[in-house]
Regions:
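Catalytic activation segment of kinase domains across protein kinase-like and atypical kinase folds
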Residues: 498-503, 513, 518
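Hydrophobic, well-ordered secondary-structure scaffolds
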Residues: 481-482
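Carbohydrate-active enzyme catalytic cores, enriched for enzymes
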Residues: 515-543
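Bacterial Sec-dependent N-terminal signal peptides
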Residues: 1-24
């Protein structure tokens, strides 16, 4: 079977819904990513998440590193970035486009139409959990795994004849990160652990009850002071041995077993309100999580996760290469008919959406929920000219419909902030969203005109609302979102103009995202009547 045919079969299977939803079929296969060495760089770490918290587990025996995220740690604060000069200059840009002076139009738009206050805020890392194990630099029989069946990582290795095991979950039900440390001989669990952060001016303290706290605030960016306050709390529960806490370091010596707990919380309530108490929230998560055993916590977590996972299975045959590490299977894929790797990849995609988008939280951003930087590429925002939409394309067709709730709430919120932007920039009713937004739900045109002069982000997101109705037949949902659809349609009804050559109604100025066109001799993206806009607006008006 060649690769084109294999992926063609996969596409057909997904498209027509020929995917069994039987728990027994899924249980017969084991879906996991596994490796025989620790991660060397962040992109090799294994992702865990519960929608709100993200963790990237490196699995290094001597110095475990788990990079941590909390979904509401973003730079900046509530704001609107619409440029009031746009109202005057958009007609001038439009005239230049209709005159065929595309590059001149694009240059003017960059100078006078695009946002001048900020281009949206970056999603930011919280920091890292570090766990140091003295004497574990020389190890053998190493194994590292991400189980897609149970949403947990496992690390095993051997030092001086002792077998060590680490199991990590980002609990869906307890909303904390837990790391269970065990060995096959008593009294062998000894480690020091602490929280670190790339943020400036963080405060790290040791509190009574063997607890370490790390408190900070998000970053200044493009002149907008960070106002998201956050706190992480670190503690442990040991069986046997001794535990102590001083100078921001938690130490356990000679234990039979230990559970490390991390909770993180912020002051973020919604895009307009950041008056929450991160310390109280973080403490509450931790206290509630420690009222039951790790075994119970893991079962609750796994049961919650599998309610989503087991709705859909994809069986492409035997796992004939199960003895080969995942990185080698990917490398060998050109030469092998590894159909089970395709099925694993399918479930991995579902896994990532389950872990990065849960009802009540934020949508999955450019990097889902995982980011190790303060200023990541493209700010790890919500890019609405295909990326945000792509995150959610699998949601309905793979039976994860309710995971759209964070996306739908974002759409509802930008439909409110976008009303002001439509008025300020276009003098229009309805609402507009350009090619990017962030946690503050900015809707102005950002970056430079070649990428950002595109007012159809709202129309594309509205398609997701309509598809929810098509998949579910939920008339109550449709009734609740109809005003959003109507007001997006109203905006385009008011801003579309007749182009002079044919009197066609078009959106102008706009662009086909990141595509230059022949009319400009390949020098400009700025144009009128782009096919993408035409299709999106047709879909919106005929929904």
């Amino acid at each position: 079977m060649n690769k084109k045919r294999l992926f063609g079969y996969l596409f057909v299977l997904v498209s027509v819904g020929n995917i069994s939803a039987q728990e027994s079929r899924l249980s017969a296969q084991e879906y996991k990513l596994w490796y025989d060495r620790p991660a060397q760089v962040w992109t090799e770490a294994l992702p865990l998440g519960n929608g709100r918290l993200g963790a990237m587990v490196y699995g290094t025996p001597a110095t475990e590193q788990i990079q941590l995220n909390e979904e509401t740690i973003w730079a900046g604060r509530p704001n609107n970035n619409a440029n009031p000069n746009a109202l005057e200059y958009i007609p001038r840009v439009r005239d230049l486009v209709f005159a065929g002076k595309y590059l001149e139009a694009q240059t003017l738009a960059t100078e006078k139409v695009m946002a001048k206050t900020n281009s949206g805020m970056p999603y930011q890392s919280f920091g890292d959990l570090r766990i140091a194990f003295p004497g574990h630099t020389r190890y053998t029989n190493y194994y590292r795994e991400l189980s897609l069946d149970s949403a947990r990582t496992l690390v095993r290795y051997e030092v001086d004849g002792v077998q060590y095991r680490r199991e990590t979950i980002t609990s869906f039900t307890d909303q904390v990160i837990m790391v269970r440390l065990t060995a096959n001989r008593p009294g062998r669990i000894t480690f020091n652990t602490q929280l670190t952060s790339p943020h400036q001016d963080v405060v790290i303290t040791s509190e009574e009850g063997n607890c370490v706290t790390l408190s900070g605030v998000s970053s200044l960016h493009e002149g907008l002071k960070g106002k998201v306050e956050f706190q992480g709390r670190l503690t442990a529960r040991n069986t046997g041995g001794q535990m102590a806490c001083a100078d921001g370091v938690l130490s356990v010596e000679g234990a039979d077993e230990a559970i490390v707990y991390v909770s993180i919380a912020t002051n973020f309530n919604n895009y307009q309100d950041i008056t929450g108490n991160p310390a109280e929230r973080a403490k509450d998560y931790l206290v509630r999580a420690m009222t039951h055993s790790f075994t119970e916590a893991r079962k609750n977590h796994t049961d919650f996760y599998r309610r989503y996972l087991t709705r859909v299975s994809l069986d492409l045959g035997d796992n004939r290469y199960e003895h080969v590490t995942t990185d080698k299977r990917v490398e060998n894929f050109k030469q092998t008919n590894d159909a089970h790797l395709v099925a694993t990849y399918f479930q991995f995609g579902r896994y990532l959406l389950i872990c990065s988008s849960q009802p009540g939280g934020q949508p999955a951003n450019l990097q889902g929920i995982w980011n190790d930087k303060l200023f990541p590429s493209w700010d790890s925002k919500y890019t609405c000219n295909i990326n945000l939409e792509m995150n959610y394309w699998p949601s309905e067709v793979t039976n994860l419909s309710e995971l759209n709730e964070p996306l739908f709430r974002l759409i509802r919120e930008v439909s409110e902030t976008g009303k002001e932007t439509a008025r300020i920039m276009y003098g229009a009713n309805g609402w507009v969203l350009h090619h990017n937004t962030d946690i503050w739900r900015i809707t102005g045109a950002v970056d430079k005109a070649p990428s950002g002069l595109w007012p159809s982000g709202g129309a594309w997101l509205c398609r997701h609302l309509w598809e929810r109705y098509l998949y579910t037949g939920d008339t109550e949902f449709l009734r609740s979102v109809y005003p959003i659809l109507r007001e997006s349609g109203r905006f385009f009804d008011e801003i579309m103009v007749k182009e002079p050559a044919h009197n066609w109604l078009v959106v102008c100025p706009s662009n086909s995202p990141e595509n230059v066109h022949s009319g400009s001799n390949g020098k400009s993206t700025t144009a009128a009547g782009c096919t993408l806009d035409n299709q999106l607006i047709f879909n919106l008006w005929t929904a």
